[in-house]
Regions:
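Transmembrane beta-barrel domains of Gram-negative outer membranes and organellar outer membranes
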Residues: 58-210, 255-259, 269-271, 276, ...
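Low-complexity, intrinsically disordered short segments enriched for Gly/Pro and polybasic residues
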Residues: 15-16, 21, 168, 216-220
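Cleavable N-terminal export/targeting peptides
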Residues: 1-68
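Detector for outer-membrane/organellar transmembrane beta-barrel domains
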Residues: 191-271, 279-280
Length: 322
């Protein structure tokens, strides 16, 4: 199949997510801003469709330096946003990525996540993502969907090319999340809001040849959020209904030219009286056979979810990039 047809077909399907999200802003200034961003994104996709050749070639950045699309759609690891801009576009190029990921916990919860991101000139990122959370026997045959629209801006440094100093690449980001099933389960267990906005700052540095000649990537985040279980159980709670500052960390080692192994840790708030929420962590292995494709397998520990303790899962993600 022609790479462009596949890639942009996925992107046009994902644009429907944005249409649902911005309905909650009907008539507001925020909606006008979203509509402008969406129009710009559609123009970008159409331009690539018109002028793209049958053989897609990725941008000129180094392999893996766009990361992968994380749970909420930003470029990064599986759990955490990184300061890296998605795709492989340089400061003169536009990069794009689309992915699909699936996990099933030992308690039967299912997580399906898909979305795409566009990186503009290695400076600005726009992402769209939808996550579906299957409730298994907690509420049989039911699921909760969450839509996320995110933006990220690189404000300082270059994670790859600033090797002569200690300064990392630094980016700030915002993620607007809309829980489509709020009145069904989240509200009943004590969640206060159907939508929320997360703010984060990320610092990422790639150390070339740091460990026995292997490249080492380190990342740290600070996130301001009210989300319960990333937003899948709504925002705020009957215990706490204010923003908390939550740190997160990632480390990855490049075993060879196209294989990364790493770990992540993400702290989370604990807002609902009756539902204890634990921090999330993972161990991951990502294979980059080319710039256009990556496959990630991970073991995730999500701790307590709703009425089930010690929830762990194997996670599999596929991504195409340009």
């Amino acid at each position: 199949m022609n790479f462009y047809k596949l890639f942009f077909g996925i992107n046009f399907c994902c644009l429907q997510i944005i249409s649902r999200v911005i309905k909650s802003f009907q008539g507001s200034t925020t909606m006008k801003i979203f509509e402008f961003l969406i129009s710009s994104l559609r123009l970008t996709v159409l331009t690539c469709l018109i002028f793209g050749s049958g053989q897609a070639s990725a941008g000129d950045r180094l392999l893996a330096t766009g990361g992968v699309i994380q749970l909420e759609g930003a470029g990064g690891g599986g759990l955490n946003p990184w300061a890296l801009i998605t795709g492989y576009g340089t400061d003169e190029q536009i990069g794009l990525s689309a992915n699909y990921a699936k996990a099933r916990t030992n308690g039967g919860y299912e997580i399906d996540s898909g979305g795409f991101g566009v990186g503009f000139y290695n400076r600005f990122e726009l992402s769209v993502n939808q996550t579906k959370f299957g409730l298994n026997n907690t509420v049989p045959h039911e699921s909760i969907e969450m839509d996320t629209v995110g933006v990220k801006l690189r404000i300082l440094g270059d994670a790859v090319y600033d090797q002569d100093n200690w300064i990392p690449q630094v980016a700030v980001g915002v993620q607007y999340k809309k829980n489509e099933g709020f009145s069904f389960v989240p509200k009943l267990v004590g969640s206060q809001h159907s939508n929320g906005i997360d703010f984060y700052i990320a610092a990422t540095k790639l150390y070339l040849g740091a460990i026995y000649g292997r490249n080492l990537l380190l990342n740290a985040n600070l996130q301001a959020t009210k989300a319960n279980q990333f937003g899948l159980l709504g925002f705020g709670g009957d215990k706490h209904d204010s923003y908390s500052i939550n740190p997160a960390f990632s480390a990855a080692l490049m075993l060879n030219d196209n294989l990364f192994i790493g770990a992540e840790y993400r702290t989370k708030p604990n807002n609902i009286k009756t539902l204890k929420e634990d921090d999330a962590k993972d161990l991951f292995l990502t294979w980059f056979p080319s710039k256009n494709l990556s496959i990630t397998s991970a073991y995730i520990d999500l701790g307590n979810i709703a009425n089930k303790n010690n929830q762990t899962a194997w996670y599999l993600s596929g991504q195409i990039s340009y």
